[in-house]
Amino acid sequence: MNLILLLVIGFLVFIGTYMILSLNLIRIVIGISIYTHAGNLIIMSMGHYSNKMTEPLIHGSNTNYVDPLLQAIVLTAIVIGFAMTAFLLVLVYRTYRVTKEANIDVLRGEEDENEQ
């Protein structure tokens, strides 16, 4: 299970990096969103305890349990990531409406050759 989770996190980081290095603004926003999902999976993977530890209130059972604090942190990160993605999509949409371009190279403008 841990190997599969590690491979999924690595794949998400790879895809996120590939999309962030693209020139299209929409792909960059989607790549940032994929990065947040990879970060959430990393945080969730840290929450599993071993079989030797028991629950703080229930003694005598050897079942696995998960730290609820990390789940709360991930839930907060999901909400913040959704708000950030929505804001960036609106920003990209407004930029496209004003400039009619979604390519970063075109939005940078031309450099003056006379200035040094």
UniProtKB/Swiss-Prot annotation:
Entry coiled-coil feature ranges: none
InterPro entries named among the record's database cross-references: CPA3_antiporter_subunitC, NUOK/Mnh_C1-like
Pfam families: Oxidored_q2
Keyword Cell membrane: yes
Any single GO CC term annotated in Swiss-Prot or TrEMBL for this entry: plasma membrane
Membrane topology summary: Multi-pass membrane protein
Stretch forming the signal peptide: none
GO MF entries: antiporter activity
Primary location group: membrane
Cellular localization per UniProt: Cell membrane
Entry keyword set: Antiport, Cell membrane, Ion transport, Membrane, Transmembrane, Transmembrane helix, Transport
Membrane-spanning parts: 3-23, 28-48, 72-92
Complexes and interactors: May form a heterooligomeric complex that consists of seven subunits: mnhA2, mnhB2, mnhC2, mnhD2, mnhE2, mnhF2 and mnhG2.
Family: Belongs to the CPA3 antiporters (TC 2.A.63) subunit C family.
Protein name stated in the entry: Putative antiporter subunit mnhC2
Organism: Staphylococcus haemolyticus (strain JCSC1435)
Lineage per the UniProt record: Bacteria, Bacillati, Bacillota, Bacilli, Bacillales
